[in-house]
């Protein structure tokens, strides 16, 4: 189905599209008439696209380390973890800078597809042996994400390693807090 031989792949009315980031752009451009997730402003599109590309870097590091630890993929785990920490430092620093100017998300004052693209790899980094302890802004960003009204934990994913939110509460499979 996917000419690149990868997942994910989207089929929409006979249109086949591979690549997670391309799928996010397509879905937002086609179905989000409010521009809540993907702006029509070229400057904002550029910023969003910058973070979509960054999500690919996180895939090659944090997600790769997780594939190694969870599924036994053969790769240079030390290099993947090193790059994962470098990527998390960049993300954390950016989130700190954004917080200073009143933004809680990667590009705007609300989540965009840029946040969606980066979130799963950051949230699951610890499953690849990459601790989030040194990245408080990233941890806060994850917790903000989990508090979104539409947030649903993906089936089969543990409650994000029992990670606590800023109030010291854990999230269960339904995304609800419990002590």
Residues covered by each model-derived region:
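GST-like domain detector, emphasizing the conserved glutathione-binding G-site
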Residues: 1-85, 97
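A structural signal for well-ordered alpha-helical segments within the folded catalytic domains
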Residues: 21-22, 46, 57, 82-89, ...
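Non-transmembrane alpha-helical segments in soluble domains
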Residues: 24, 28, 49-52, 85-88, ...
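A broad structural signal for alpha-helix termini and local helix breaks/kinks
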Residues: 31, 95, 128-129, 149
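Short beta-strand edge/turn micro-motifs at domain boundaries
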Residues: 48, 150-152
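GST superfamily/GST-like fold recognition
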Residues: 62-63, 105-145, 152
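Hydrophobic alpha-helical bundle segments that form small-molecule/ligand-binding pockets
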Residues: 91-107
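Acidic/histidine-enriched, glycine/proline-rich intrinsically disordered or flexible terminal extensions
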Residues: 157-179
